[in-house]
Amino acid sequence: MKKIAVIGTGLSALSLVHHLPALDVTFFEKSWRPGGRITTRRHENYIFDHGAHYLKQDHGVIGLNEFLDKINATKTLKGDFCSNIQNQSPIEEKQVIVGQKGIESIPLELHKSLGYPTNFSSKIKKLKNHKQEYYLETDNEEFGPFDFVFCCMPFEQAENLLNSFIDYNNISKPVFDVIWTIMIAFNKRLGSPFQFGYHLSPNISFLMNQNFKHEFFSDECWVINM
């Protein structure tokens, strides 16, 4: 059976492995838990979905909704949505898919359902090839041999790890816009007519109320993207 190393446990890595045939797969993750940037932040009794807010029902990935429901990772909610708050667009009801216990439930439950061993808190610093086999190195450990290695990580991290295998000179580097995320809690309900929407102001592109996803805290929490 082929031995496969997968670096990263974000949604791209988990989706990839979910669609592979039965192989000897080992995950490597620099963080302490799976999920990558699909995370849920906790502070005292508050919960904030940070990095991704929800899944659209019509995202186009065939079979995903049914599978996530089967592994009890998600729930479907209806919320009041405004497409352009600043321009006073009409508020409409919109159905979205959210995590059972925060958006992190999606990667956590998907990772658990795969059942493959994972080396957490293991940042791969070097990838070596010897006699058509691959070895992975952290600061103090070496793993291998592997027949194949899948790197599921942001471009900059992949370039640092794979520049001895891939000529990046002819590959255009992606350019990203910075998004700032603010997680804020109020000691009372604000009575907002919507739960989520776009363009509150020229500087606030999106915001979402966390209470309609997590009704077990009494104060009001919002995640704001700028």
Residues of each region from the PLM?
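Beta1/beta-strand and adjacent pyrophosphate-binding region of the FAD-binding site
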Residues: 1-12
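Glycine-rich FAD pyrophosphate-binding loop
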Residues: 7, 19-43
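Conserved SAM/SAH-binding loop
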Residues: 11, 52, 121-125, 139-141
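N-terminal FAD cofactor-binding segment of flavoenzymes
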Residues: 19, 39-82
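Central helical "cap/lid" subdomain
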Residues: 35, 143-195
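Short beta-strand to alpha-helix junction loop
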Residues: 54-62, 87-109
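A conserved short coil-to-beta-strand element within the FAD-binding core of flavoproteins
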Residues: 120-134
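Active-site substrate-recognition segment that forms the wall
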Residues: 183-226
